[in-house]
Amino acid sequence: YEISACLVGSEMCIRDRVPEGFAGQVLKGDAKRIVAMSSTHIAMLDAIGEVRCITGVSGIDYISNPDIQARRDSIGDVGYEGNINYELLLSLDPDLVLLYGVNGASAMESKLEELDIPFMYVGDYLEESPLGKAEWMVVLSEVTGKREKGEKAFAAIPVRYNALKKKVADSTLGTPSVMLNVPYGDSWFMPSTQSYVARLITDAGGRYIYQKNTGNASIPIDLEEAYLLASDADMWLNVGMANSLDDLKASCPKFTDTRCFKNGEVYNNNARTNTAGGNDYYESAVVNPDIVLRDLVKIFHPELVQEECVYYKQLK
């Protein structure tokens, strides 16, 4: 799908910046009242010191950000796609609604156009580079008229990330093989070797065990193939909702005799989950790729990292 929008800096006159013949919406970069439809948008605005601009969200109970929770009585929860409370959305008088479109254009588009409410897609979900995802905070700094703050906030992240990546690469430690995920129905979805999670595993000194998928999306494999992969893996990561080995045993009983399960080398990215089940990994990790990398290095090569894991925990 194609989205047409033009973002102009708040210090410039709009008519001087819009390309001739441009017919899309024009966003002036000085948003003060923002409705964020994804928790990653909240994390990005928080990273650049602009979380107070958020006046509306989607699914407030599942959001981990402490500022949003502290202000929850004054923040509108507009609901989810397919069941948006447009009356509430209008009452929030937003300068901008931030959208995402993982499966195509948002169903909110046409209604927002009808209501003359400015909107913009934040494309972090299209990025496979961990640093590329985080850099979208700079785009949101432009939206809020704080470009310099955004660039400064982002600049330190690749420095820390690449320093740790180099430390791992310069070491003479082994390369543990890593299995990912749990079944969904009768299939087991395995990410591409070029995916966000596979890149993090490689940069942390691990070896993603499924090298067949070199495309641009996860692909399903059958449970038999998944069992063979898990049997060869040194470690098993990102195991759904499991909080313990017993949880994993209940959902994947046939996998309890795999080496990684028997050795207790099973780790999940749900160490920061709130009472409603909202997982901060899917919120703030997008702006903290260096911390996610550090967690994985701690798991693969604990002698290289002193800090304890933030997003990951070992299942007991």
Regions found by a protein language model. Name each.
Residues 1-13:
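Short, small-residue-biased leader/transition segments that mark boundaries at the very start
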Residues 166-252:
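Flexible, glycine-rich surface segments
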